[in-house]
């Protein structure tokens, strides 16, 4: 039986969605499409919410108006090494 991802792993999966969109600090994604991409990759709604909460608590993401998720400088710093790896 597969183990469930930790909230940190889910948060990093959400950051990976920003990375796939070539996002930078202060870029915004709509929560709905981000959630859809997360679930398409095998995650659940509960895992997405747990990851989002973890990322917000750690200053990686901010929840904005109109169902948006904003990548912070701290969040960008977390994904930046992954964006430059081969």
Question: Which residues does each PLM region occupy?
Answer:
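A generic structural-conservation signal
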Residues: 27, 47, 64-65
